[in-house]
Amino acid sequence: ACTLECEGKLPSAKAWGTCKELLQLTKLDGVQDGEKYQDNNDSHYIAKKYGGFMKRYGGFMKKMDELYHAEPEEDDAGGEILAKNYGGFMKKEYDSNRDASDLLRELLATSGDPESAIYHDNNSETPGEMNKRYGGFMRGYRRSTDLEDETRGIQKRYGGFMRRVGRPEWWQDYQKRYGGFMTRFTDSFLPSDEDGESYSKENPDMEKRYGGFMRF
């Protein structure tokens, strides 16, 4: 190499160093040009997909991403901080949403048929599990189905009047609550059965409309 340099067929070592630096700069410029070309293609694709939205807010979103970019580890740490600050509140909210989705899924599985839903619940879960899972909701639902025959009998006897007034047990509740006071009030102000029957004979329209309720 030294002989070739002396004969002038090869450049000196200093010239070789300069050539190497130029080659490195050329490669670096080529890499940067490739990245710019890729960025331009990505920007063109985003602008084509989202239209004027990215043209108007793209720079703002990019700047915000640069300022507040969070790594995946930081996201996990943020979740841990929330769990420490709020305790079981977030877990309770998640569990309630999951229970609601499970209940909706089971109701859809029965196609909206209450009888099939009750059959499914009776054969799949114990009362303790039902109470733990749904609380008082299913107890009220089952109670309403158990009293279906009784309610049908009351409606058949008293018609639409009971829907406006209520069930006849309200008078018994008052008697239990106020004791002998209501008994004296009944004897003093309310008509007896004989008076009620005579009143029904005098007013057949009332008897036809309200049945035996008016005799009470």
From Swiss-Prot:
The N-terminal domain contains 6 conserved cysteines thought to be involved in disulfide bonding and/or processing. Keywords: Cleavage on pair of basic residues, Disulfide bond, Endorphin, Neuropeptide, Opioid peptide, Secreted. It is found in: Secreted. GO terms for biological process: chemical synaptic transmission; neuropeptide signaling pathway; sensory perception. It comes from the Eukaryota. Signal peptide: none annotated. One of its GO terms (molecular function) is opioid receptor binding. Its main location: secreted. One of its GO terms (cellular component) is extracellular region. The keyword Disulfide bond applies. Residues 114-133 are annotated as: Disordered. Pfam families: Opiods_neuropep. Enkephalin neuropeptides compete with and mimic the effects of opiate drugs. They play a role in a number of physiologic functions, including pain perception and responses to stress. Belongs to the opioid neuropeptide precursor family. This is Proenkephalin-A-B. It comes from Xenopus laevis.
